[in-house]
Design a protein with these regions (language model features):
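Flexible mid-to-C-terminal extensions adjoining Fe-S/redox cofactors in radical SAM and related proteins
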Residues: 83-151
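Radical SAM enzyme [4Fe-4S]-AdoMet core and its adjacent flexible, acidic
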Residues: 1-81, 85, 89, 95, ...
């Protein structure tokens, strides 16, 4: 079974995150999410990057308006009732999974949001190399085995 483990990068979580990294198998990727609304100094970012070499992708929101994104073409978000949206963060409905009405609205389109600050969204921006970085599992945050993720 493939899996990764994550921690929100709050200062009070750093010691526990270090212990967790020490206890996890080196084969398990420990990812650090930047805390929503938090700005990290370079020193703080270095602490988190020592645990997660890919923390830099999470550290700052990504400009996304008008940029190519895989959502709505090869990636969708589905609610329990079958409502299909291009992205978890874009409220516009494409249709319904169960009746197939979403299919006619699939296609390439630019992101309508000014910024994207969550992995489940920005991982699909075509301007970022994250499909290559997380080639082992994009949404699961499983890095490409050829890219070191521990130090």
């Amino acid at each position: 079974m493939r899996y990764s483990v994550g921690v929100v990068g709050q200062p009070e979580h750093l010691a526990a995150a270090r212990r967790l990294r020490a206890e996890l198998s080196p084969a398990v990727y420990l990812w650090i999410n930047a805390a929503e609304g938090r700005t990290y100094t370079d020193a703080e970012a270095a602490d988190w990057t020592a645990l997660d070499p890919h923390f830099g992708y999470s550290r700052n929101a990504h400009l996304s308006a008008g940029r190519a994104c895989r959502t709505g073409e090869s990636v969708v978000s589905v609610d329990g009732d079958g409502t299909v949206r291009r992205c978890h963060f874009v409220p516009e409905e494409l249709g319904n999974l169960y009746d197939g009405s979403y299919r006619a609205r699939l296609g390439p389109r630019a992101c309508p949001l000014p910024v994207c600050d969550c992995h489940i969204g920005y991982v699909h921006l075509e301007t970022l190399p994250l499909y290559e970085v997380f080639a082992g599992g994009v949404l699961e945050r499983i890095p490409d085995a050829r890219i070191p993720h521990t130090r």
